[in-house]
Amino acid sequence: MVMRKLQLPLSQTQKVRFERAIERLQSLSSSANSDASVIVTDSIPVNHDDAFLKGHGTSEVDGELLATVCGVVERVDKLVYVRTLRARYKPEVGDIVVGRVIEVAQKRWRVELNFNQDGVLMLSSMNMPDGIQRRRTSVDELNMRNIFVEHDVVCAEVRNFQHDGSLQLQARSQKYGKLEKGQLLKVDPYLVKRSKHHFHYVESLGIDLIIGCNGFIWVGEHVEVRDPMAIDDQKDEEMISSSSTGKEQSHIPLETRQTICRIGNAIRVLSNLGFTVTLEVIMETVNLSNSKNIDIHDMLGSEFHVVVAENEAERRRTKRKK
């Protein structure tokens, strides 16, 4: 486990507490994982009697296997490689991603995904606003800006890779599409682990949380996923809605906005500490801030970072005992 150095001013007491918490975390991590954290030129233990394959991040020098990058040693059968930390997003087909539209082009939107290439969302690869499955027409192409414009935040799924290395996205489900009434956060992609569920609804708080595999995380007011038939039935009503009604619909209650900010700051703290970002850890951090009556803006201070590190060490120790 590679911990980050906290870039915040700490008092002498806070520094001692923080270092003690990090030592506990590192001891728990090293005893729980067989994977070894390495830096450049570290020796990687291998059995030379058995054949092994040198993978990415390794090099053999004088019969010894050395790491050429910082990261965690991974072994797949005979292959030995080093998984780098703090690297850019490495996409896989089926990944749930959150991104920001940077260009509206011919029959497509280009989306920034924290990857070395932009994602491409084709007009034909998403549900139309009317919810009807049909061929896309020239009228649909002319109305593309009514769906997404530059700087819109969207959620989609990685469909495949194009010949130029860019990602082809798809948003054919009602759970994908434009994200509104919330905030977008960015963490290092290695802090997000792929799982079966990346869409979360925190019912007690009325908040939607989308943890993108690319390190972009969306925190927003809960939005019900509407059935396509319901969308079609409400189409006429939406067409006659007034601008004042639209303003009312865009209003977010103060309590909801405060909750979004609290969850957002919890994610920022976890990112600063280099902790894996999961729903469980996020909500525990939020509950910790509430139990200690810490204001939203104070969550980004040094003291709360130390408290979170101590709490995470205790959580992992308790979890290991079970």
From Swiss-Prot:
Major site of localization recorded for this protein: cytoplasm
Domain notes from UniProt: The two RNA-binding domains (S1 motif and KH domain) are separated by a conserved linker of five amino acids (KYGKL) and can bind RNA independently. Both domains are also needed for RNA degradation and interaction with RRP41, another exosome subunit.
Oligomeric and partner information: Component of the RNA exosome complex. Interacts with RPP41.
Location of the KH domain: 182-237
Function according to Swiss-Prot or TrEMBL: Non-catalytic component of the RNA exosome complex which has 3'->5' exoribonuclease activity and participates in a multitude of cellular RNA processing, maturation and degradation events. In vitro, is an active and distributive 3'->5' exonuclease requiring a free 3'-OH on the substrate and releasing nucleoside 5'-monophosphates. Required for normal embryo development.
One Gene Ontology molecular-function label: RNA binding
Domain S1 motif: 94-172
InterPro entries membership: Exosome_RNA_bind1/RRP40/RRP4 (IPR026699), KH_dom_type_1 (IPR004088), KH_dom_type_1_sf (IPR036612), NA-bd_OB-fold (IPR012340), RRP4_S1 (IPR048565), S1_domain (IPR003029)
Cellular location(s): Cytoplasm; Nucleus, Nucleolus; Nucleus
Gene Ontology CC annotation, any one: cytoplasm
Organism name: Arabidopsis thaliana
Gene this chain is encoded by: RRP4
Disruption phenotype: Embryonic lethality due to embryo developmental arrest at early globular stage.
Tissue-specific expression: Expressed in roots, stems, rosette and cauline leaves, flowers and siliques.
A biological process from GO: maturation of 5.8S rRNA
UniProt similarity note: Belongs to the RRP4 family.
Keywords: Cytoplasm, Exosome, Nucleus, RNA-binding, rRNA processing
Protein name as it appears in the record: Exosome complex component RRP4 homolog
Lineage, broadest ranks: Eukaryota, Viridiplantae, Streptophyta, Embryophyta, Tracheophyta
